């Protein structure tokens, strides 16, 4: 994974708390146990402070997971950590919803709130 | 964009707090980076004070974005600013939901609350 | 409109706060600007005090709007006023959802709460 | 109606507050005004105290309404009263949703909370 | 049932409260009254403390119910007890939704919260 | 069952083959084996010859099944026979779709075509 | 009803058989028996010959039914007759789907094919 | 599997070709390779000749697959063979739709037609 | 409109008849009567002969309609003509589905088949 | 791509024409133009002759496309060719449905029929 791929641009409305949600239904990584691909939808929700994440760079950041072996829980928390570091938001949440494996479906949700 | 297109009429029930929601699923603007059109749904929710926005004028106001190059975040905040200025509501919220680009879907939500 | 059409019957369980919701997806009135018909769904929700509204009389009350020219906001607030007057409920809410005009959909929501 | 049909069994987990929801989409009674059948879905939600309602007996209790003439509001409150008496729950709610009559759909919701 | 089948792995992000939801729509057990199979969906939601439940072991744990005679309420509370014991979470919830029997559908929801 | 309840009116467009479909999702009869009610949707499709079936009389005809013990297959064929006899259509089809019993759902479809 | 309201324009592609479908979900007329309004969706499908129906005039033609007392079967066949006369199509079909009355839903379908 | 569990009753309308569809969404068997359970929906469609299959016996016949190791293709063809032998229908079709394994969903469809 | 924007590439499987469907839900043009934008979905289906249409060039071709005043029927037939000329397919169909105007929805379908 | 990964097993019912459908909604390959991943659903339908395709081997065969650059049309025809060669079916069809790119969705369908 390469968090350095993430680019930002300046928030034009820093005085107003507003929410940006970016949904990527085409996320794929690899199960470190079986070596088989996992498929999921990654939802990013945040309230920007001074920076917004640039969409195309976010897409390229996500693409780096394509051939990486990593568990659901760690995908979710890693993306949250990388994006918090890059964007320094007021609040941020990552929801990862995974296609069924063995008939069983998993969703992981992690949140961050900046100290006030 | 021409906020002066926005017309209002007098709220007949100013003593009661009630909510008006106006959904426009046929909004289109242009991506300033690629020059390609963006398509979205703009939802306006507000509690009127003394004025209500006139529907037809709102439609013509939205149409002015058709060939304008502007980012998702700025569309949302600009519409909120223009409508708050024209309608002077008690509360107002703009939700813009955008069709997928590169497989990725974006929603931006901004709110305003009048000082009491 | 004829609020005198509204009939009530005695609430058999006045000591318990319970909710009655009545949805009419076949409401129609006339746009006072264009003279063309509007179509909507009117949802009535209330907590009865001593009276409940009689269903058939409510239907006939709604029918009186069929050829009346009246704006969305006023339909909603007028129905709320008429029903509050007839039923004297503890709480009441009217939600009117209107079919698209010019591609734009409107919903108006108004509430009433009796003084305690 | 025969509330004596309702049977209960002992709650095996009385120290934990948990919720049981039982949905019957095949409820039918008779309109006392027209003599025509009404069709509805009855949803029962409760937090058991020492007793749980036995499913088959609940089904037979509901069947007793099949040829009884009774209004929507009274069906809902009567079922709540009968079940509260039989099951002595910590909390209980009855939601009755009725098929359209004259194009109009009705839902009645009544709740009970035991004194603590 | 064999709670000893449940395996855990170390939570890599113990300092952050995040939620894991695991849905199994292919659960089946046997009705102790009729000897006929029951079919349901078991949803597990929890905030891990130091441990996460291993998915494959959870699947094998669920499979042990396949030929066991047990009531809906007990399935739900037993799974909660076994998982709380194995995973020692901060919070945990089990929702069991059962296919209709005699036209009637049942859902049981039980929760656990660790003492703070 | 009382086929004599079925009333007809004269087809105003006998020279044109057109189709009438009448769907009754509120049909109920009784299972002759268990004595428990069955619930279903009866769909009638026909091409009228000289007569059309009158809607209200059809409703009253269907109501006669409410407390009658009769199997799915026989309900379907009996309704087809009674309606063919009363309406003398060019073509007619009855589709009965029944709510699940023991988790199993049944649909029966029977057709009639007049000799040409 | 006023078939003279129907206007047409010249088909620009008379040498190609193509299909035009126009769906009006906001049709309303009056039941001649009860005097109560009926609500339906009218679908028009046709292959134009030399003429196409003008949309706005079609809308005004439909509006004339708003306060007319007329049965479902006759609405359908009358609209077909009026449109065939005005548009002289190669083929035409009218489907009228009506909201439930007494829990029962009706659909009427009538077709026309020009002699070749 | 025990085809001898299948019971039949006499078709009361042998002179009319009509269709019976019986859908069982609660079918389960075991994968002979992995020993893990498979879940599917079995749809049976047939035109009876002199016999109809009795619903309860069909349910018990299906239950015998619960702990049997058998492939999708063979489940489908075996059920068709057993039912054709027991019911001697004019036509019969079995559709088995299986829940995803490894993200992949399978449906098998087999038909029988009696010689005329 | 600029048909010269359409680019093609060589069909790699010219000996097999196969179907390509390309759906564009983001089509917009302008109503020549009102000057207001129309929104629609254009579906292209074809069996290639020696050429396939290049996707990006198709997108740019569609974009040329954005500010052009043209009726539904002509959009559909014009696109068909331009694509037939550029791609020389064995068969081709264009379906244009338009968002409601005045509550009324229109779909136009036109087909082409090469002489054999 | 490695067609040699495809394994088969003997069809146990070679005398009966029956259909097997296998849907893989987790297919991904790479666009040869942009180097970005494509996502699609591959549906395989076939009537087996003497052989059936083994599910797990089919999954591994599909996985080989994960990092291959190949156009939609060629994916579809290549899979058909490989599977026809391995399985020698009576009939076979491949349907590939691709997620939107630039707002535009593509579906490719190719079929094979053995000579009789």
Swiss-Prot record, chains A, B, C, D, E, F, G, H, I, J:
GO terms for molecular function: preQ1 synthase activity. It comes from Chloroherpeton thalassium (strain ATCC 35110 / GB-78). Keywords: Cytoplasm, NADP, Oxidoreductase, Queuosine biosynthesis. InterPro entries: GTP-CH-I_C/QueF, NADPH_dep_7-cyano-7-deazaG_red, QueF, QueF_type1. This is NADPH-dependent 7-cyano-7-deazaguanine reductase. Disulfide bonds: none annotated. Pathway: tRNA modification; tRNA-queuosine biosynthesis. It is found in: Cytoplasm. The gene is queF. Substrate binds at residues 53-55, 72-73. One of its GO terms (biological process) is queuosine biosynthetic process. The active site is at residues 31, 38.
């Amino acid at each position: 994974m390469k968090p350095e791929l993430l680019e930002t641009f300046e928030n034009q409305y820093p005085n107003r708390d507003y929410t940006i949600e970016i949904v990527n239904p085409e996320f794929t990584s690899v199960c470190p146990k079986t070596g088989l691909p996992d498929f999921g939808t990654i939802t990013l929700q945040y309230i920007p402070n001074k920076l917004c994440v640039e969409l195309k760079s976010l897409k390229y950041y996500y693409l780096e997971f394509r051939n990486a072996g990593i568990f659901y829980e760690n995908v979710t928390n890693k993306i949250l950590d990388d994006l918090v570091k890059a964007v320094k938001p007021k609040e941020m949440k990552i929801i990862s919803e995974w296609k069924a494996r063995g008939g069983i479906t998993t969703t992981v949700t992690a949140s961050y709130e900046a100290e006030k």
